[in-house]
Amino acid sequence: MNINIQDLKKKIIYRATYRGTKEMDSLLVSFTKKYVDILNDEDIICLSNLIDIDDENLYKYKQSLKTTVKINENKVTKLFRDFVYKKI
C-alpha cells in the first residue's frame, strides 16, 4: 500500500480537531501540532492509529487507566501518555 504521508498528516490534524469532546479536541490538536512534523513516516502511521481510538479509551490510556481496547505501545503512545497539555 502506497501512503502519501503529507495527506495522512492533514487527515490526522483534521481528525484530532473534530473528535466529539472539547477536551479531547484540545488535547489532541495540541499534541498533533507539536509532533506531526517531526515524526518519521512509521511514527505518523502510529499516530494515525492512535487517533482512531475512541475518546473514552484514549482518555483512560492517557491517565494510565484500564482501557477496553488494546493499545499497542510504541514511541507515539509514549509521547502521548507523557504529553503535558497546557491550556492557553
List each model region and its residues:
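Positively charged, polar, low-complexity stretches
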Residues: N2-I88
